[in-house]
């Protein structure tokens, strides 16, 4: 496997409930490298672009309003298989269907307040990273323990 990048966002409910450090810790403990991090209150335009795939769905307006209602912690994580692994760490979209031990399984109850967003594939990850971050906001660096994280 080659190193890849994914976009992760802690939604306003996760920030307000104080889960930022716990979520960061789960990704770090898994062995992924944080290469982009910022906190912002997204504009309606950014939220609409991010969730554009849902534009025709009945919940789109409420979703945009929610995401732009408070601070979001936007992140880019890097590592081997990070997209699929992040999806497993996050858990099912519906928290009541998410396995215990996942972020949503442990911390969320309602689908409308499910704490976190993660890219669902390579193309989506590239789109979302480019939407939320400028290239100069991403940090290229090597961890001092990289040889202990993977054979590659």
Swiss-Prot record:
The active site is at residue 117. The keyword Transport does not apply. GO terms for cellular component: cytoplasm. InterPro entries: NDK-like_dom, NDK-like_dom_sf, Nucleoside_diP_kinase, Nucleoside_diP_kinase_AS. PROSITE patterns: NDPK, NDPK_LIKE. It comes from the Bacteria. The keyword Cytoplasm applies. GO terms for molecular function: ATP binding; metal ion binding; nucleoside diphosphate kinase activity. Its main location: cytoplasm. Keywords: ATP-binding, Cytoplasm, Kinase, Magnesium, Metal-binding, Nucleotide metabolism, Nucleotide-binding, Phosphoprotein, Transferase. It catalyses: a 2'-deoxyribonucleoside 5'-diphosphate + ATP = a 2'-deoxyribonucleoside 5'-triphosphate + ADP; a ribonucleoside 5'-diphosphate + ATP = a ribonucleoside 5'-triphosphate + ADP. Its EC number is 2.7.4.6. Homotetramer. NCBIfam families: PRK00668.1. Major role in the synthesis of nucleoside triphosphates other than ATP. The ATP gamma phosphate is transferred to the NDP beta phosphate via a ping-pong mechanism, using a phosphorylated active-site intermediate. This is Nucleoside diphosphate kinase. It comes from Prochlorococcus marinus (strain AS9601). The gene is ndk.
């Amino acid at each position: 496997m080659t190193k890849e990048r994914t976009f992760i966002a802690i939604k306003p409910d996760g920030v307000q409930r104080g889960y930022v450090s716990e979520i960061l810790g789960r990704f770090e403990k898994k062995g992924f490298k944080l290469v982009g991090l910022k906190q912002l209150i997204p504009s309606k335009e950014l939220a609409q672009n991010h969730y554009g795939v849902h534009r025709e769905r009945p919940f789109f307006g409420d979703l945009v309003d929610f995401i732009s209602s408070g601070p979001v912690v936007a992140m880019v994580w890097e590592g081997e298989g990070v997209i699929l692994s992040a999806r497993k760490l996050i858990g099912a979209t519906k928290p009541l269907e998410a396995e215990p031990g996942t972020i949503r399984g442990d911390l969320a109850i309602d689908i409308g307040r499910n704490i976190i967003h993660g890219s669902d594939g390579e193309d989506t990850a590239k789109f979302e990273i480019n939407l939320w971050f400028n290239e100069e906001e991403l940090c290229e660096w090597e961890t001092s323990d990289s040889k202990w994280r993977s054979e590659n």
